Curated annotation (Swiss-Prot):
Keywords: Acetylation, Chlorophyll, Chloroplast, Chromophore, Manganese, Membrane, Metal-binding, Phosphoprotein, Photosynthesis, Photosystem II, Plastid, Thylakoid, Transmembrane, Transmembrane helix
Name this protein carries in UniProt: Photosystem II CP43 reaction center protein
Functional note: One of the components of the core complex of photosystem II (PSII). It binds chlorophyll and helps catalyze the primary light-induced photochemical processes of PSII. PSII is a light-driven water:plastoquinone oxidoreductase, using light energy to abstract electrons from H(2)O, generating O(2) and a proton gradient subsequently used for ATP formation.
Entry similarity comment: Belongs to the PsbB/PsbC family. PsbC subfamily.
Length: 473
């Protein structure tokens, strides 16, 4: 029976290309896919598909290492990371490597080590990818049955799913261990303007952790994106890691239920479509997280959020005009509302002007000035610290706007290129990639369902009408 595994099924999808181009048995005649269909030619060659995936991982890790070293080589310690267009070093700094109080970089050596480790890893992966693509067995089922599979073997597929879930759970726990035992992580909320600290009092209460999932996604609630303390983030990773590992063990030990066997399409392309859908959702969530959240993505490294820059400008001008003698509690703005401060519909004291729409911003430099009913007028008059003024002035001039039209009142330069923040890059790139992955999901899901239903043939290439028509010239 094992020989059945390596029989190459001719897929019922016909493709246009030179069918005579042969590549070591991976040609159109034997696979049903032309060279440009990429890994589709390897659908039933588990050994070669392994090579493609390992080589792909090598490319990813090589990019990470090379880009990491590139950022280290160009890094200027005197400037904030977000002014230097960095997208990798902020992640390392957030994990607590190389930074001290206020997010100041005190040691770039950990960043160098990270880059070199990724480069070395990519060499190992690259070698493995080339080996399995060119020299290793075409199929794994005969020689290494543990690593072999048949796409329609539902039990094997859920076992592979379980292994992946366990690996994801271990990844979540790596962050937990870093935060608890290996030096801690950067906490933007640490007193005095942020510092690296070990997390000692994890939030493990299910009502708090899962309460985030039940929140509305809109302003003031903000779903999981509203998380604003590290205890909740690390505690959430404990829950997530545990669920992934337990779910992985469950999927390894069990077989799919009858309803799942009936409801799902069990083919390689179907699994690809499911994966693309999941990554698409993650991309959209990551977009919102990096755009709005300044705890998981500290503003010291990624630059301020849009609402944060807008509120920082209101705060900066409040400080300036208060010093010049303005009564910031009662001054009227051009619309008749408060120029510096006003009340929200619920009675909370908030910044006036166009930034009123960002009333629900929470930021480490602003929270000490709040009282039980919003911004506290007496604290604004007596308690503003120099570091809060410096930080808000800095954030006001580094809004993540790019070329947005609606800027929350932030002053922008008409005839110059405005500063572009890594927050803008990370948010927009994840949104665009999330969208394209969603389109890829629709495409592959449609093909997988059609193939499962047995009606995907494509055009008959031997008798299509165009062959009998006269040449254009």
């Amino acid at each position: 029976m094992k020989t059945l595994y390596s029989l190459r099924r001719f897929y019922p999808v016909e493709t246009l290309f030179n069918g005579t181009l042969a590549l070591a048995g991976r040609d159109q005649e034997t696979t049903g896919f032309a060279w440009w269909a990429g890994n589709a030619r390897l659908i039933n060659l588990s050994g070669k598909l392994l090579g493609a995936h390992v080589a792909h991982a090598g490319l990813i890790v090589f990019w990470a290492g090379a880009m990491n070293l590139f950022e280290v080589a160009h890094f200027v310690p005197e400037k904030p990371m977000y002014e230097q267009g960095l997208i990798l070093l902020p992640h390392l700094a957030t994990l607590g490597w190389g930074v001290g109080p206020g997010g100041e970089v005190i040691d770039t050596f950990p960043y160098f080590v990270s880059g070199v480790l990724h480069l070395i890893s990519s060499a190992v992966l690259g070698f493995g990818g080339i080996y399995h693509a060119l020299l290793g067995p075409e199929t794994l089922e005969e020689s290494f049955p543990f690593f072999g599979y048949v796409w329609k073997d539902r039990n094997k597929m859920t076992t592979i799913l379980g292994i992946h879930l366990i690996l994801l759970g271990i990844g979540a726990f790596l962050l937990v261990f870093k935060a608890l035992y290996f030096g801690g992580v950067y906490d933007t909320w640490a007193p005095g303007g942020g510092d690296v600290r070990k997390i000692t009092n994890l939030t493990l209460s299910p009502s708090i952790i899962f309460g985030y999932l039940l929140k509305s996604p809109f302003g003031g609630e903000g779903w999981i994106v509203s998380v604003d303390d590290l205890e909740d983030i690390i505690g959430g990773h404990v829950w997530l890691g545990s669920i992934c590992i337990l779910g992985g063990i469950w999927h390894i030990l069990t077989k799919p239920f009858a309803w799942a066997r009936r409801a799902l399409v069990w083919s390689g392309e179907a699994y690809l479509s499911y994966s693309l859908a999941a990554i698409s959702v993650f991309g959209f969530i990551a977009c919102c997280f990096v755009w709005f959240n300044n705890t998981a993505y500290p503003s010291e490294f990624y630059g301020p959020t849009g609402p944060e820059a807008s509120q920082a400008q209101a705060f900066t001008f409040l400080v300036r005009d208060q010093r010049l003698g303005a009564n910031v509690g009662s001054a009227q703005g051009p619309t008749g509302l408060g120029k510096y401060l006003m009340r929200s519909p619920t009675g909370e004291v908030i910044f006036g002007g166009e930034t009123m729409r960002f009333w629900d911003l929470r930021a480490p430099w602003l929270e000490p000035l709040r009282g039980p009913n919003g911004l506290d007028l007496s604290r604004l008059k007596k308690d503003i610290q120099p570091w809060q003024e410096r930080r808000s002035a800095e954030y006001m001039t580094h809004a993540p706007l790019g070329s947005l039209n609606s800027v929350g009142g932030v002053a922008t330069e008409i005839n110059a290129v405005n500063y572009v923040s890594p927050r803008s890059w990370l948010a927009t790139s994840h949104f665009v990639l999330g969208f394209f992955f969603f389109v890829g999901h629709l495409w592959h899901a449609g093909r997988a369902r059609a193939a499962a239903a047995g009606f995907e043939k494509g055009i008959d290439r031997d008798f299509e009408p165009v062959l009998s028509m006269t040449p254009l010239n």
